[in-house]
Amino acid sequence: MFEFITDEDERGQVGIGTLIVFIAMVLVAAIAAGVLINTAGYLQSKGSATGEEASAQVSNRINIVSAYGNVDTSGSTEVVNYANLTVRQAAGADNINLSKSTIQWIGPDTATTLTYDGTTADAENFTTNSIKGDNADVLVDQSDRIEIVMDAAEITTNGLKAGEEVQLTVTTQYGSKTTYWANVPESLKDKNAVTL
């Protein structure tokens, strides 16, 4: 069963040094494998979190159903003093809390970011009203409709005049953006409200 080799040239010898080198190589390989496994797990969890965030940004959006402006006829010229957006959830969106949203207003003479105020709209804030649904600031169902109210007379110099336009970008708490161009008609004469 065992064969004894008596010739010195055919015998292999393993010394203590060779054994130490072998053990060191095994330890280094084990540590490297552990680092690779940990890195792969970290990258997988990071990639999964990034994918979920990207999915939320794409799917948790609002749709702007309509926009109109209230016309102020008390001055020497007619102006839109309030701009209003009617919004709803986009298809497949989760609950959207408009009180945690912002609106970027880029108008003819002003650029500002509006935040939510539950009571009044002014130069720095917008407010909301429930048109359909139980909440005035949270879109829970796709059938819910909420009106966003912005005080154009406070945000811009004396309101929006005939023919002017403003770019409105609504950013939800998920980071998704919806942009709407509100265009004031060329004539506001004898009107109380106009489509923007």
UniProtKB/Swiss-Prot annotation:
Could you tell me the Gene Ontology terms of the biological process aspect for this record? archaeal or bacterial-type flagellum-dependent cell motility
Tell me if Lyase is a UniProt keyword of this record.
no
User: One Pfam family from the UniProt entry?
Assistant: Arch_flagellin
GO cellular component terms listed in the entry, alphabetical order: archaeal-type flagellum
The superkingdom of the source organism is Archaea
**Keywords, in A-Z order:** Archaeal flagellum, Glycoprotein
Q: Which NCBIfam families match?
A: arch_flag_Nterm
This protein's name: Flagellin B2
Q: Give the organism the record lists.
A: Halobacterium salinarum (strain ATCC 700922 / JCM 11081 / NRC-1) (Halobacterium halobium)
* Gene it is expressed from: flaB2
